[in-house]
Amino acid sequence: METLGSAKEELDSLFDQLKEVRIRQAHNAGFENYRDYKHRELGRFSYSPEDIMAFHDAVEHEVIPFLRELNQERRDALEVESVRPWDTAVDLDGKTLKPFGDSEELINGAIRILKDVKEGYAAQLEMMKNSGLLDLENRKGKAPGGYNYPLAETKAPFIFMNAVGLHRDVVTLLHESGHAMHTFATRDITITPYLHTPSEVAELASMGMEFLTMDYWGHFYSDPSDLNKARRDQLEGALKFLPWCMIVDAFQQWIYTHPGHTAEERDVYFAGLMDRFNPGVDWS
């Protein structure tokens, strides 16, 4: 923080210079501000800036109070005066879910889950298994991460990940399976650029699959308490993502609709957003 603080003046100056470039881009294209220019450039026709502001308000009034209740429970469980940022990462029950032993158990469990969602999904994932299109287990020297990659020649998807026997591996495979089902669904499109989904919808199929499959996670968990923990963690994780998402988006909206602001005003506005969307975490 000391190093960043010492460079604040320089970083603020660079920010202002880059902001002015974007403002000129928007004005040269005939738009009042850069936000409206980007909405048009990105082809966003299904929602407006006003819809986004309404989304911010909905999160503030519906999600934030619930997250504050959760953090109140966390504060009481940890027996601390306030929940600090590092307290949010503590698993309160200290139980690590280990739902499978090897990649064979993982893939077979995922196939059973997908069959309960839609039999065709299970058949496609089983085809990937039989065709060698799954590289799931962690091993020495293997690249980190996880992804689904559509293969251009065969039009089939390939899933890569690093499973080590934890619950997050189940979610990762189901997530990437959502991408894979999307790949199968679009494989007959012949115009290659049409296959490239824009970033704001690229995760719909994958994250949607995470939630569509939650009712069937019992294929991995025979203990009801483990199943409830897995589901609760999934739902809480989704809700906890929203405050920071709103802060970043609201900040960008304000930056470009208030082009004459100073660095000091920018700091004050960001601090206000941190307060507005604070789920009960003490950052002092």
List the predicted regions and their residue ranges.
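Cation-handling catalytic/transport regions enriched in His/Asp/Glu
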Residues: 1-284
